[in-house]
Amino acid sequence: MAKIGVVISSLYACGGEERVVSLMANEWVKQHEVTIFTFEDREREGNRNDYPLSGKIKVERVFHSGDSFLRKVIRMVYFRTGLTEGTVCQYLLKKAFYPEKFLKEWIERINAGNYDLMIGISGVNAMLLGYIKDHIHAKAISWEHSSFEGYFDPQRGYYRNRMKMYQRAAEKLDGCVVLNQDIQGKYRDQLGISATVIYNPRSFASEQKADMAKKCFVTCGRVEAEKGYEDLLFAINEAKDHSCQDWKLLIIGGGSLTGRLNEQMRELGLEDKVSITGYLHNVQEQLLKGSVFVLPSRWEGFPMSVTEALELGLPVVAYDLPAMLPLVRDGEEGRIVPCFDKRKFAMAMEELAGSDEMRRQMSEAAIRKANELSPEKIAEQWEDLFSRLLR
């Protein structure tokens, strides 16, 4: 039995990262001692996790100490402008995100807890562990939850202009886990980091499956630019006078672009065909209202929403992103469309809407694919990694 610590920015938010960490922690704790460290504000955030945790898992809230007005200003300027990869800017960014007092507290916390292995969830916590790796006794790895572009795209990547910072910190770690082979190759070629691929598990098992007779396309995720929902409005508008004329579109989720999408719906006259739910907790119930899942994302690491769709037997229409390769084969579990070709996306939606038999066959294939992604099977791959690191 190993003592494992997991560092995550948020455990009590509603998102894919929180969901999959909860799922795997529930598996790890069957054989190990697991503590999850989360940065939620103790006074403002509740204690309820949307995704059930085993009572054996210890959850510890921690503060981001050592902060100051100047550090907050530097972070604000970075998020608004991106700053640059210059030496001075990198020095300022490290001090702004990882002040010395903060790093010292983490060194003491990990060493005092006698952890065998620490797992940093996503880039910000991977860098934290990298900066203190030389001063802790535990092995340390990162578990990255986005595509390479999602992190390092110069315009929209979360860690834009911090690639060198990430690289210097991450190369000190004992391991790195990514979600697909495309990310693995880019980490190797552009960062010089050898990464292990472990897929995310499906987030639930369901006896109830989607009804292929329903005439509804469904999608799920944050209503933000990278999800490409404007393409769905184009596609449903293109197809509304053909085989999709009786079909509706349900967007499960909310976000900063909800207002803009609603305005576009009105301009296109789609108010009766498209609805946006806002943030909901009963995602499974909402997904069952559809018979085809559509995903027009610009990038994905390993879309949990697709694993959920597969589990419910929903055929999938998606762009040809590398993240889709392990999940959906064109003509098997769904239709894969050349990236960002809105007209072909609309044609794929029309094709599935027009064939009950195609939807039924793809639904059966989707269920078989979901069975390969059970948490128990994914946990076996993690155990292999733990054994290699700790032997």
Each predicted region: which residue ranges?
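A conserved mid-protein helix/loop that constitutes part of the nucleotide-sugar donor-binding site
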Residues: 15-23, 215-240, 251, 256-262, ...
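Donor nucleotide-sugar binding/catalytic pocket of nucleotide-sugar-dependent glycosyltransferases
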Residues: 139, 148, 165-206
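Nucleotide-activated donor-binding/catalytic signature segment of Leloir-type glycosyltransferases, i.e.
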Residues: 262-278
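Aromatic "clamp/platform" in nucleotide-sugar-dependent glycosyltransferases that forms part
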Residues: 279, 298
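Short hydrophobic beta-strand element within catalytic cores of glycosyltransferases
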Residues: 315-318, 328
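Conserved acidic donor-binding segment of nucleotide-sugar-dependent glycosyltransferases
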Residues: 330-331, 335-342, 351-356, 371
